[in-house]
Amino acid sequence: MNDIVTERSNGILRVQFNRPEKKNAMTGGMYTRLADIFNEANEDEETFVVLWHGAGDSFCAGNDLGDFLHNPPGPDAFPQGALMDAFVKFEKPIVAAVQGAVIGGGTTMLTHCDVVYAGASARFQLPFINLALVPEFGSSYSLPARIGYLRAADLYLLGEPFGATRAAELGLVTRVVPDRELLATATQTAQKLAAKPGGALRASKRLLKQGFIEQVKAAMKAEDQVFFERVRSAEAKEALSAFLEKRPPNFNKTKTPVAAE
């Protein structure tokens, strides 16, 4: 079974995460495949818009931690980087339809989408701090740019879950709709976009994002360096061990004592 399924019709490329049994959690191979899909769609003259959604009851539960632990990212093996580059270069509209679990990268990837519909069941979370990690996908810039610094800091530094209504209030999603109407609503918008003049769509998106792209690239570069350091930190090792052992993490034992004066 393919972890990502695509179908193109009438100028719309449907991209569907297809690991419903894992809530569409991402593996390294899926990052690579998704990057290839977006790069190819960017060059395809018959693709005008991407419609992105997940199979089953969730959009994406972030990284598959089993795959993450067996294939930890590093400077020489970082499939997420290829997808980041593909997002930055992508010139066509991306319409996302999200429901259920929208966790970690499942949330940060949305900051690169142009229209985002959330089903009422959507539950978002940026839990990087709980894993002793840091923001990624350029979201240390793109999220504050979209919703403001204080709101972004609240989501990142506390790492707590929030619902679809809150996501709409923050400006992270375009609109909340009933789950049963989610895909139909997103499809209708994709059809409207596909009927617009493609050259004008791409030019408009470039203008809307002028200045934004260079800032995101700089953020990605900084994030990558810090992320690789954090993955190998004592705090991250404790967080991941605690997750696998189903216990609360104890970060006190990873803290360096302050020398007495």
Q: In which residue ranges do the predicted regions lie?
A:
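Residue-level signal for tight coil/turn positions that link beta-strands
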Residues: S9-N10, G56, E91, R180
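Terminal peptide-recognition signature
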Residues: V15, R19, L34, W52, ...
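Crotonase-fold acyl-CoA enzyme core
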Residues: I4, V88-L201, E229, S233, ...
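Short, charged, surface-exposed hinge/linker loops at domain edges
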Residues: K205-E214
